[in-house]
Every structure is written in structure tokens, then in C-alpha cells.
Regions:
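Amphipathic alpha-helical segments used for helix-helix packing
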Residues: 114-138
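Hydrophobic alpha-helical segments that form the core
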Residues: 121-127, 170-189, 205-208
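Generic hydrophobic, amphipathic alpha-helix propensity
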Residues: 23-31, 48, 73-77, 81, ...
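Amphipathic alpha-helical packing segments from all-alpha helical-bundle domains
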Residues: 97, 101, 134-162, 204
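N-terminal intrinsically disordered/low-complexity leader segments
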Residues: 1-22, 216-217
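Helix-turn-helix
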Residues: 26, 34-73
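Amphipathic C-terminal alpha-helical segment
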Residues: 41, 109-113, 134-135, 160, ...
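Hydrophobic alpha-helical connector segments
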Residues: 72, 86-121, 176-179
Length: 217
């Protein structure tokens, strides 16, 4: 009987906490999607709340400002993305195959988002980072951090490719930075032109940059 009473008291609290978590997750997802679809400056707190179906009081319960939501939303996006990155860049796969599959993932994601939003969205980190680079240091730093985190996967694959002799580049750090710049540039160009064709030869361009000696089919 006492246990039943205890459960009865605990259950509403658990349900309330679950609902709060779901509300916060909804705000993070909607905020991320809206800003990736358009821009940080064009999306207001009202826009996020309206799309999420959540009142502003709940928004400010979780986030002091739109900027704070963005920082957390981009961190959450990276946490969700990491398992796919770990799988693609698994050391069990040949290094060039890892890089190939990464390029294919980029194209697939851009194609999916273009179909969803009606236009090419580009890289979310590059877009918000460049937009706010001189306006919000916290967001700029977070965008840089997440871009660097992705670059580490590329650097590791290039280092393995150098060791096995499947590429002509010699410095994995320099090559990964150059490759990251290429990827960001092509994604920006695809967004500006609103044309996925810009990315159709992404894989081939990357392989040429690395001086790949053999490429898997």
C-alpha cells in the first residue's frame, strides 16, 4: 500500500519531467531547422515558438536568449550526427572509402534538405558561423569548434591513407584543413546558386585534391 502511494506521488513528477524534456528537445530541433532553412537574423523567438507550438514562457524557461538556444541546438545536432560520422570513418574501412562515403553523405543530406525546404541549405555550421562571426563570439566559437571536430575525422582518414600510400599528399593536417575549406566553399556555392549540381562532383574533386591513386567503386 505504501509502495502504491509512493508510485502515485512519483509518477506525476516523472511525467512532468518527461514533458519538459520533450518541450526543450522540440524547441532545439525547430530552432535548428528554421535557422538552417533561412538564417539566424530572419528567425525570431516568436517564429520558433509558433512552429514548435510552444509558448514564449516555456522558451525562456529553458533559454535566456535565442543565441543560447542556437549554441545548444548546434551541439545537439553534432551529438546526433556523431554516430554516423563514427560509422563512416571507422578504421575498419579503407581510408579512401571513408572519405568517399563522407562526400556521399554530404550530397545525400543536402539533397534531402533541398527536397524538404525547397532550396539548397548548405552547411549549418558555416552558415550561422559566417553570419554571426563578428556579432556573437559564443556562436562563432561554437561553429568553429564543431567544424574542427568534423575536420579531425578527415585528418585521421588522410593520415591512414598517407601511411598506406594511397594518396600523394604528405601532410595530413594541411590536407585536412585544405579539404575542409574546399567542402565549405562548395557548400556555400551550392547554397548561393541554389543548385545541387555544384556538389555532384564533390567526391571526384576531393580525390583529386588528395592525389588519390586508387578509388573504390
Amino acid at each position: 500500500m505504501c509502495d502504491d502511494v509512493g508510485v502515485g506521488r512519483i509518477r506525476p513528477t516523472v511525467l512532468k519531467m518527461k514533458k519538459m524534456c520533450e518541450t526543450k528537445e522540440r524547441l532545439l530541433q525547430v530552432g535548428f531547422d528554421l535557422i538552417w532553412d533561412s538564417s539566424y537574423g530572419s528567425v525570431s523567438v516568436d517564429d520558433i515558438c509558433k512552429r514548435a507550438g510552444i509558448n514564449k514562457g516555456s522558451f525562456y524557461h529553458f533559454f535566456p536568449s535565442k543565441a543560447e538556444l542556437v549554441v545548444e541546438a548546434y551541439e545537439e545536432h553534432w551529438r546526433e550526427k556523431r554516430p554516423a560520422m563514427d560509422r563512416i570513418f571507422s578504421p575498419q574501412s579503407p581510408p579512401l572509402e571513408r572519405i568517399q562515403n563522407f562526400c556521399r553523405m554530404i550530397y545525400a543530406v543536402q539533397k534531402e534538405k533541398a527536397e524538404e525546404y525547397g532550396h539548397v541549405c548548405g552547411c549549418p555550421y558555416t552558415s550561422v558561423g559566417s553570419e554571426l562571426a563578428t556579432l556573437d563570439e559564443k556562436i562563432r566559437a561554437r561553429a568553429e569548434h564543431l567544424m574542427n571536430a568534423g575536420s579531425k575525422y578527415i585528418e585521421s582518414a588522410i593520415a591512414d591513407a598517407i601511411r598506406e600510400g594511397s594518396v600523394t599528399v604528405k601532410d595530413p593536417v594541411f590536407a585536412s584543413v585544405t579539404l575542409q575549406s574546399l567542402l565549405c566553399g562548395m557548400l556555400v556555392e551550392a547554397r548561393v546558386q541554389n543548385d545541387l549540381k555544384v556538389l555532384e562532383n564533390l567526391e571526384g574533386t576531393v580525390m583529386k585534391l588528395l592525389g588519390a591513386k586508387a578509388v573504390a567503386a
